[in-house]
Amino acid sequence: MAIDNTQIFIALLTALIPAFFALKLGKELSK
């Protein structure tokens, strides 16, 4: 089964979105 570009993109989004929110939250809390 070949890996699609779409699947890679979705996997990246799924990994990056929570990380982005965690980073934003961390900056808000450290004020």
UniProtKB/Swiss-Prot annotation:
Its main location: plastid. It is found in: Plastid, Chloroplast thylakoid membrane. The keyword Membrane applies. It comes from the Eukaryota. Keywords: Chloroplast, Membrane, Photosynthesis, Photosystem I, Plastid, Thylakoid, Transmembrane, Transmembrane helix. The chain crosses the membrane at residues 7-26. One of its GO terms (biological process) is photosynthesis. It is a single-pass membrane protein. This is Photosystem I reaction center subunit XII. It comes from Euglena granulata.
